[in-house]
Amino acid sequence: MEHYISLFVKSVFIENMALSFFLGMCTFLAVSKKVSTSFGLGIAVIVVLGIAVPVNQLVYTHILKENALVDGVDLSFLNFITFIGVIAALVQILEMFLDKFVPSLYSALGIFLPLITVNCAIFGGVSFMVQREYNFTESVVYGIGAGTGWMLAIVALAGLTEKMKYADVPAGLRGLGITFITVGLMALGFMSFSGIQL
């Protein structure tokens, strides 16, 4: 149990997708204007990562890995296309669910919901799972932890962005300029966790 808690904490803070690996920056910067929208997208990323990583782990272990189907057959060259297909299917299911049951969040997320399909944070989580050879349970914990870390970062940035609306930001830094500086300072803060050994 301690191993799984360590893996979760590591994936949320030490190896944060957004602030340590800078993955998923397109949606991270574009949707971080309001806390409510950022929180909704963060939940969507947690759901997609929490399902995509373990499902792709099963696909990789039982189909794509060398000697998984037949001795001597290695289908790992199909990793990228297979993983993207699984992620795309999961995002489509999530999009239909939100459209049906939470239309306000669906309309607030707009084009960024389908973009989760090609969000490099999602694909990065799946790729890290393969590279680190996580088993199924570790994949579930890692997927949920990585999504939680990404949500924590985007909600924190949205909160800071909302506060900066009332700040006296120099004209040349308004908009993306101050956002990049803020993200850089947040990343420096998260770097302090990198010395922790779990």
From Swiss-Prot:
Q: Name one GO molecular function term.
A: oxidoreductase activity, acting on NAD(P)H, quinone or similar compound as acceptor
In this record, what's one Pfam family?
Rnf-Nqr
- Write down the EC number: 7.2.1.1
Coiled-coil regions listed in the entry: none
Q: Where in the cell is it found?
A: Cell inner membrane
| Keywords, comma-separated and alphabetical | Cell inner membrane, Cell membrane, Ion transport, Membrane, NAD, Sodium, Sodium transport, Translocase, Transmembrane, Transmembrane helix, Transport, Ubiquinone
Function (record text) = NQR complex catalyzes the reduction of ubiquinone-1 to ubiquinol by two successive reactions, coupled with the transport of Na(+) ions from the cytoplasm to the periplasm. NqrA to NqrE are probably involved in the second step, the conversion of ubisemiquinone to ubiquinol.
Q: Which family is this protein grouped under? A: Belongs to the NqrDE/RnfAE family.
Protein name per its UniProtKB record: Na(+)-translocating NADH-quinone reductase subunit E
Q: To which species is this protein native?
A: Actinobacillus succinogenes (strain ATCC 55618 / DSM 22257 / CCUG 43843 / 130Z)
Q: What is the lineage of its organism?
A: Bacteria, Pseudomonadati, Pseudomonadota, Gammaproteobacteria, Pasteurellales
